[in-house]
Amino acid sequence: KTILIMGSTSDEPHAKKITDQLDEYGIEWEQHAASAHKQPLKVLEILEDNKEKDNIVYVTIAGRSNALSGFVAANSEFPTIGCPPFSDKADMLVNIHSTLQMPAKPLF
């Protein structure tokens, strides 16, 4: 199962691209909007609600500083895939760089 966590509802168009592909491959998913900056307890609640489940992958959708990806990865044992939205190549580079430099606890 894939659990998408968006930083805000403004990320829904980007999330739809992902969920359309998940639907195409028959992969079950659920979607939430919760900011690591503004609603960290809500993010933790989502993670807590799913910690006993099997075969979970988190997809985080947040731009700019993208604390969401690192926050989810650091607080869950499940894989986390950061998939930031972007509007152009410059925005893509900022978002990818931010996603890659966010710290998370190692799995090993």
Description of each model-found segment:
Residues 16, 72, 100, 104:
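Solvent-exposed, flexible loop/coil residues
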Residues 21, 75-82, 99-102:
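A glycine- and small-aliphatic-rich helix-loop capping segment at beta-alpha/alpha-beta transitions
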Residues 27-52:
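N-terminal beta-loop-helix "entrance" segment that forms/cooperates
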Residues 46-85:
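Glycine-rich phosphate-binding loop
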Residues 88-108:
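Short, glycine-/small-residue-rich phosphate/pyrophosphate-handling segment
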